[in-house]
Protein backbone atom coordinates (compact mmCIF):
# COMPACT_ATOMS: atom_id res chain seq x y z
CA UNK A 1 0.00 0.00 0.00
CA UNK A 2 1.34 3.41 -0.98
CA UNK A 3 0.26 7.02 -0.54
CA UNK A 4 0.93 9.82 -3.01
CA UNK A 5 0.51 13.39 -1.76
CA UNK A 6 0.51 16.63 -3.73
CA UNK A 7 0.50 19.64 -1.43
CA UNK A 8 0.26 23.32 -2.17
CA UNK A 9 0.16 26.02 0.48
CA UNK A 10 -3.65 25.92 0.63
CA UNK A 11 -4.60 22.23 0.42
CA UNK A 12 -3.16 18.74 0.03
CA UNK A 13 -4.52 15.92 -2.12
CA UNK A 14 -3.83 12.41 -0.81
CA UNK A 15 -4.37 9.18 -2.74
CA UNK A 16 -3.95 5.82 -1.06
CA UNK A 17 -3.37 2.87 -3.42
CA UNK A 18 -3.63 -0.70 -2.13
CA UNK A 19 -2.09 -3.86 -3.58
CA UNK A 20 -5.11 -4.33 -5.88
CA UNK A 21 -4.70 -0.78 -7.26
CA UNK A 22 -7.87 0.33 -5.48
CA UNK A 23 -7.74 4.00 -4.51
CA UNK A 24 -9.00 6.08 -1.61
CA UNK A 25 -8.78 9.87 -1.67
CA UNK A 26 -8.38 12.34 1.16
CA UNK A 27 -7.82 16.07 1.59
CA UNK A 28 -6.02 18.00 4.30
CA UNK A 29 -4.80 21.53 4.72
CA UNK A 30 -1.77 22.44 2.66
CA UNK A 31 1.67 22.00 4.20
CA UNK A 32 4.59 24.29 3.49
CA UNK A 33 7.65 23.89 5.74
CA UNK A 34 8.40 27.60 5.35
CA UNK A 35 5.22 28.28 7.34
CA UNK A 36 4.35 24.99 9.10
CA UNK A 37 6.51 23.20 11.63
CA UNK A 38 6.64 19.46 12.32
CA UNK A 39 4.00 19.63 15.07
CA UNK A 40 1.45 21.50 12.95
CA UNK A 41 1.86 19.04 10.08
CA UNK A 42 1.66 15.99 12.36
CA UNK A 43 -1.46 17.23 14.17
CA UNK A 44 -3.24 18.08 10.92
CA UNK A 45 -2.64 14.58 9.55
CA UNK A 46 -3.68 12.88 12.81
CA UNK A 47 -6.90 14.90 12.75
CA UNK A 48 -7.94 12.97 9.63
CA UNK A 49 -9.13 9.77 11.30
CA UNK A 50 -10.14 8.08 8.05
CA UNK A 51 -6.65 8.52 6.62
CA UNK A 52 -4.93 7.39 9.81
CA UNK A 53 -6.87 4.12 9.88
CA UNK A 54 -4.41 2.87 7.26
CA UNK A 55 -1.27 4.36 8.80
CA UNK A 56 0.35 1.06 9.83
CA UNK A 57 -0.37 -0.64 6.49
CA UNK A 58 1.28 1.99 4.31
CA UNK A 59 4.68 0.88 2.98
CA UNK A 60 5.65 4.02 1.05
CA UNK A 61 4.70 7.71 1.12
CA UNK A 62 5.59 9.95 -1.82
CA UNK A 63 5.07 13.57 -0.76
CA UNK A 64 5.44 16.54 -3.12
CA UNK A 65 5.03 19.94 -1.55
CA UNK A 66 5.34 23.68 -1.88
CA UNK A 67 8.40 24.91 -0.01
CA UNK A 68 10.08 21.48 -0.01
CA UNK A 69 13.17 22.90 -1.66
CA UNK A 70 16.05 21.82 0.60
CA UNK A 71 17.06 18.85 2.73
CA UNK A 72 16.47 20.86 5.89
CA UNK A 73 12.94 21.90 4.90
CA UNK A 74 12.08 18.45 3.55
CA UNK A 75 13.11 16.94 6.87
CA UNK A 76 10.42 18.96 8.67
CA UNK A 77 7.74 17.25 6.58
CA UNK A 78 9.45 13.86 6.62
CA UNK A 79 9.61 13.75 10.43
CA UNK A 80 5.92 14.56 10.73
CA UNK A 81 4.98 11.88 8.20
CA UNK A 82 7.23 9.31 9.88
CA UNK A 83 5.36 9.76 13.16
CA UNK A 84 2.11 8.76 11.46
CA UNK A 85 3.22 6.20 8.87
CA UNK A 86 5.56 4.28 11.11
CA UNK A 87 6.20 1.38 8.71
CA UNK A 88 6.62 3.41 5.54
CA UNK A 89 9.57 4.50 3.47
CA UNK A 90 9.06 8.23 3.04
CA UNK A 91 10.26 10.51 0.26
CA UNK A 92 9.67 14.26 0.24
CA UNK A 93 10.23 16.30 -2.92
CA UNK A 94 9.53 19.75 -4.30
CA UNK A 95 6.19 20.54 -5.93
CA UNK A 96 8.18 21.47 -9.04
CA UNK A 97 9.12 17.81 -9.45
CA UNK A 98 5.44 16.91 -9.12
CA UNK A 99 4.67 19.45 -11.82
CA UNK A 100 7.40 18.08 -14.09
CA UNK A 101 6.37 14.44 -13.62
CA UNK A 102 2.66 15.17 -14.05
CA UNK A 103 3.15 16.96 -17.37
CA UNK A 104 6.10 15.05 -18.87
CA UNK A 105 5.31 13.39 -22.21
CA UNK A 106 8.77 12.08 -23.08
CA UNK A 107 10.17 15.35 -24.43
CA UNK A 108 12.00 18.13 -22.57
CA UNK A 109 9.67 20.89 -21.47
CA UNK A 110 9.22 23.87 -19.18
CA UNK A 111 6.90 23.07 -16.28
CA UNK A 112 5.11 25.85 -14.41
CA UNK A 113 2.96 26.21 -11.31
CA UNK A 114 0.25 28.85 -11.03
CA UNK A 115 -1.68 28.23 -7.83
CA UNK A 116 -1.48 29.94 -4.45
CA UNK A 117 2.12 30.66 -5.44
CA UNK A 118 4.05 30.38 -8.70
CA UNK A 119 7.26 28.79 -9.95
CA UNK A 120 8.83 27.15 -13.00
CA UNK A 121 11.53 24.70 -14.02
CA UNK A 122 13.04 23.04 -17.09
CA UNK A 123 12.75 19.25 -17.10
CA UNK A 124 14.55 16.93 -19.52
CA UNK A 125 13.15 13.68 -18.11
CA UNK A 126 16.02 13.23 -15.67
CA UNK A 127 16.99 16.54 -14.11
CA UNK A 128 15.21 19.72 -13.09
CA UNK A 129 16.81 23.09 -13.75
CA UNK A 130 15.59 26.30 -12.13
CA UNK A 131 16.77 29.46 -13.86
CA UNK A 132 14.96 31.89 -11.58
CA UNK A 133 14.32 31.37 -7.87
CA UNK A 134 10.81 31.49 -6.42
CA UNK A 135 10.69 34.65 -4.31
CA UNK A 136 7.46 33.97 -2.43
CA UNK A 137 4.34 36.06 -2.13
CA UNK A 138 6.04 39.23 -0.83
CA UNK A 139 8.71 39.61 -3.51
CA UNK A 140 7.45 37.40 -6.33
CA UNK A 141 4.81 34.76 -7.07
CA UNK A 142 3.82 36.56 -10.26
CA UNK A 143 0.52 35.36 -11.71
CA UNK A 144 -0.43 33.43 -8.57
CA UNK A 145 -3.51 33.56 -6.38
CA UNK A 146 -1.58 35.46 -3.71
CA UNK A 147 -0.32 37.91 -6.34
CA UNK A 148 -3.81 38.70 -7.64
CA UNK A 149 -5.33 38.79 -4.16
CA UNK A 150 -2.75 41.34 -3.10
CA UNK A 151 -3.52 43.47 -6.16
CA UNK A 152 -7.27 43.31 -5.47
CA UNK A 153 -6.88 44.34 -1.82
CA UNK A 154 -4.47 47.13 -2.72
CA UNK A 155 -6.90 48.57 -5.26
CA UNK A 156 -9.77 48.20 -2.79
CA UNK A 157 -7.92 50.16 -0.11
CA UNK A 158 -6.86 52.82 -2.63
CA UNK A 159 -10.47 53.07 -3.90
CA UNK A 160 -9.28 52.14 -7.39
CA UNK A 161 -11.71 49.29 -8.02
CA UNK A 162 -14.50 49.89 -10.56
CA UNK A 163 -17.62 50.95 -8.66
CA UNK A 164 -19.58 47.75 -9.37
CA UNK A 165 -16.73 45.54 -8.18
CA UNK A 166 -16.05 47.80 -5.18
CA UNK A 167 -19.67 47.59 -4.02
CA UNK A 168 -19.82 43.83 -4.54
CA UNK A 169 -16.58 43.44 -2.57
CA UNK A 170 -17.96 45.48 0.34
CA UNK A 171 -21.21 43.53 0.36
CA UNK A 172 -19.52 40.11 0.23
CA UNK A 173 -16.66 40.66 2.67
CA UNK A 174 -17.51 43.67 4.86
CA UNK A 175 -13.87 44.01 5.85
CA UNK A 176 -11.87 47.03 6.92
CA UNK A 177 -8.30 48.15 6.47
CA UNK A 178 -7.65 46.89 10.01
CA UNK A 179 -8.98 43.43 9.10
CA UNK A 180 -6.77 43.27 6.02
CA UNK A 181 -3.70 44.42 7.94
CA UNK A 182 -4.31 41.87 10.67
CA UNK A 183 -4.56 39.02 8.16
CA UNK A 184 -1.59 40.10 6.06
CA UNK A 185 0.85 41.47 8.64
CA UNK A 186 -0.03 39.82 11.94
CA UNK A 187 -1.61 36.41 11.36
CA UNK A 188 0.21 33.42 9.81
CA UNK A 189 -0.42 32.16 6.28
CA UNK A 190 -0.94 35.56 4.66
CA UNK A 191 -0.30 33.98 1.26
CA UNK A 192 -3.30 31.68 1.68
CA UNK A 193 -5.42 34.61 2.88
CA UNK A 194 -4.51 36.66 -0.18
CA UNK A 195 -5.20 33.76 -2.52
CA UNK A 196 -8.62 33.19 -0.92
CA UNK A 197 -9.94 36.19 -2.88
CA UNK A 198 -9.49 34.36 -6.19
CA UNK A 199 -13.07 33.09 -6.09
CA UNK A 200 -14.28 36.69 -6.00
CA UNK A 201 -11.88 37.65 -8.79
CA UNK A 202 -13.08 34.70 -10.86
CA UNK A 203 -16.70 35.82 -10.37
CA UNK A 204 -15.75 39.03 -12.18
CA UNK A 205 -13.49 37.45 -14.81
CA UNK A 206 -15.51 38.99 -17.66
CA UNK A 207 -14.90 42.54 -16.41
CA UNK A 208 -12.28 44.72 -18.05
CA UNK A 209 -10.62 45.31 -14.69
CA UNK A 210 -10.09 41.61 -13.93
CA UNK A 211 -9.15 40.79 -17.53
CA UNK A 212 -6.41 43.43 -17.48
CA UNK A 213 -5.22 42.36 -14.03
CA UNK A 214 -5.02 38.69 -15.00
CA UNK A 215 -3.29 39.46 -18.29
CA UNK A 216 -0.71 41.68 -16.56
CA UNK A 217 0.06 38.96 -14.02
CA UNK A 218 0.36 36.28 -16.70
CA UNK A 219 2.71 38.51 -18.67
CA UNK A 220 4.90 39.14 -15.65
CA UNK A 221 5.05 35.42 -14.97
CA UNK A 222 5.92 34.52 -18.56
CA UNK A 223 8.59 37.20 -18.79
CA UNK A 224 10.24 36.28 -15.49
CA UNK A 225 9.73 32.52 -15.27
CA UNK A 226 9.44 31.21 -18.84
CA UNK A 227 11.37 33.56 -21.10
CA UNK A 228 14.37 33.18 -18.77
CA UNK A 229 15.05 29.80 -20.43
CA UNK A 230 17.15 30.17 -23.57
CA UNK A 231 15.12 27.62 -25.54
CA UNK A 232 11.65 28.66 -24.32
CA UNK A 233 10.39 28.98 -27.91
CA UNK A 234 11.56 25.47 -28.81
CA UNK A 235 9.77 23.39 -26.16
CA UNK A 236 6.28 22.96 -24.77
CA UNK A 237 5.44 25.01 -21.70
CA UNK A 238 3.17 23.06 -19.35
CA UNK A 239 1.17 24.31 -16.38
CA UNK A 240 -0.46 22.94 -13.27
CA UNK A 241 -2.56 24.79 -10.70
CA UNK A 242 -6.01 26.30 -10.36
CA UNK A 243 -5.05 29.76 -11.62
CA UNK A 244 -3.59 28.48 -14.88
CA UNK A 245 -6.66 26.27 -15.38
CA UNK A 246 -9.39 28.79 -14.56
CA UNK A 247 -7.75 31.55 -16.58
CA UNK A 248 -6.35 29.33 -19.33
CA UNK A 249 -7.79 31.54 -22.09
CA UNK A 250 -5.92 34.55 -20.70
CA UNK A 251 -2.78 32.45 -20.34
CA UNK A 252 -2.95 31.19 -23.92
CA UNK A 253 -3.58 34.69 -25.27
CA UNK A 254 -0.60 36.17 -23.45
CA UNK A 255 1.63 33.23 -24.38
CA UNK A 256 0.78 33.67 -28.06
CA UNK A 257 2.08 37.24 -27.91
CA UNK A 258 5.51 35.86 -26.96
CA UNK A 259 5.44 32.86 -29.32
CA UNK A 260 5.26 30.51 -26.35
CA UNK A 261 3.82 27.07 -27.12
CA UNK A 262 1.49 26.06 -24.29
CA UNK A 263 1.17 22.31 -23.80
CA UNK A 264 -0.74 20.75 -20.90
CA UNK A 265 -2.77 22.84 -18.45
CA UNK A 266 -3.75 20.63 -15.52
CA UNK A 267 -5.78 21.86 -12.57
CA UNK A 268 -4.65 19.11 -10.20
CA UNK A 269 -1.62 16.91 -10.94
CA UNK A 270 -2.42 14.21 -8.39
CA UNK A 271 -3.92 11.70 -10.86
CA UNK A 272 -0.87 11.83 -13.13
CA UNK A 273 1.43 11.48 -10.13
CA UNK A 274 -0.48 8.45 -8.90
CA UNK A 275 -0.20 6.83 -12.32
CA UNK A 276 3.54 7.52 -12.32
CA UNK A 277 4.02 5.78 -8.98
CA UNK A 278 1.68 2.89 -9.75
CA UNK A 279 3.95 2.02 -12.69
CA UNK A 280 6.88 1.91 -10.28
CA UNK A 281 4.90 0.06 -7.62
CA UNK A 282 3.64 -2.88 -9.70
Model-derived features: positions:
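Short glycine-rich, polar/acidic loop-and-turn segments at beta strand-coil junctions
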Residues: 65-69, 96, 241-243
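ATP-binding/phosphotransfer module of carbohydrate and carboxylate kinases, centering on a glycine-rich
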Residues: 1-60, 80, 103-110, 153-282
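Alpha-helical substrate-recognition element adjacent to the catalytic core
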Residues: 35-36, 64-72
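Anionic group-transfer/hydrolysis microenvironments
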Residues: 8, 15, 66, 97, ...
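Phosphate-binding/catalytic loop of phosphoryl-transfer enzymes
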Residues: 69-164
Amino acid sequence: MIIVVESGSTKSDWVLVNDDNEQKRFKTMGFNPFFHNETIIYNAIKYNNELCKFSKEVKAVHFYGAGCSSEELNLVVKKALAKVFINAEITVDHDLLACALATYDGSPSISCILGTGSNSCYYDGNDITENVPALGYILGDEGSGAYYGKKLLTDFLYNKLPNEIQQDFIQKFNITKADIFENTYMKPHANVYLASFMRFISDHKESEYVTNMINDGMNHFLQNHVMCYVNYKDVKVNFIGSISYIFRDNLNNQANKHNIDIGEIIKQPIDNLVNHHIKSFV
